[in-house]
Amino acid sequence: MEYAGERKLKENMGTPHPSEVVKITDSVYFLNYFGTSNATLLIGDTSCILVDAFESDGYAEAAKQEIAKITDKPVKTIVLTHQHPDHIGGGAVFADTVDRVIAHTSAAVTYGRMELLKDIVTVRNLHQFGAKLTAEEALSSGLGAVVPPNGQLRPMAVTEWIDAPKAELTIDGVDLVLIAAAGETDDQQFVYLPKENVACCGDDYYASWPNLYAIRGSQYRDVSVWVDSLDKLIALNAAVVLPGHGDALIGAERVQEVIKPYRDGINYVLEETLKGINKGMTPDELVNAIHLPVELADVPQLQEYYGTIEWSIRGIYSGYFGWYDGNPTHLGTMNVKDKAEKTIRMMGGTGNILREIADAVAKEDMQWAAELCDILLNAQVEADVAKAYKKQALEYLGRMTTSANGRHYYLSVAKEL
């Protein structure tokens, strides 16, 4: 059987890339595919600046060896585009020479008592990233091929915080403009080199539909602000954009033809969702109604290899309006087990449901099969059979989706059943 999502994901985001150093100018080098994340080397008068610090000490060590082939000037400054672990994890490899680590403050306050969620955060992170899957099962990160672990997470502490919409710095002869650009994270900043007309954009752009909502769970990512940040990137008219994941965008025309439709696609989904909410549409109605227009639907960088449009719509609804969908029936809910038992009786008993599940599986109607399995599991009847069928359904759904995050979550939970 061919799984369409799996095939598309493998063809577009499943091919391993060797690490490479791309010379952008005489003083700017793009350190690409050292692990999942990229970094950029800026050569100053007597020292170097590193924009981002890789995902682990192992990948940072490999990059450090390549840096030594380019220059004998030490890395003395690290500038972080944001503080996701995969962009800070190798910082300590440069600790013997680095004396400044610069980052932007967060544009939003982190919710309190997050430590009470540490267990479920761990579980859902493992599911989203497919940590317990084989490389073949995981297939892709959604931003490129799965890469093997290489060392440990060893970040350096931030020594200097930027708390302004824009900060102009000169570090050892290198002019930098740090531009607040909240998006995938609230502490995101662009690192712009005005003399070279080069922009490091962190994770506000990568060549996939972005994680406007992360299924591992997170605070709301302000999609409106993300669009505004992409407007800032477009307005720079940079000749080169260096993303935190994937290949460099080289040439001013190339930059515009990639970033503009990326921005337009995200903005379209945001505004159509808000218009639908204003009409009283529920999240389920919105995800069935909203699709990218034809001029954006086939844009390569808007394909759903990482996030998905459906998750984005649901995230926007929740972020703006919370959990309540406006239907007063949902102001109160039945006990899950009681509801499942009543549903089973209404459907003529467990035998009828099992036959319907088997029929759905035979017809490859796996979403329906999984939902029927949940009725039995919630009622705590025929649990072993229901789990076996649900495992089969989740494996199918995981292999049919193009989203690596979705694939990982489906297949991880299936393995646990």
Predicted regions and their residues:
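A short catalytic or substrate-binding loop motif that flags glycine-/basic-rich loops and adjacent residues
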Residues: 23, 32-35, 160-163, 170-171, ...
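Active-site HxH/HxHxD metal-binding segment of metal-dependent hydrolases
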Residues: 65-164
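Divalent metal-coordination and catalytic microenvironments
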Residues: 27, 42, 52, 67, ...
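Extended catalytic-interface subdomain
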Residues: 123-171, 176-179, 209-211, 221-225, ...
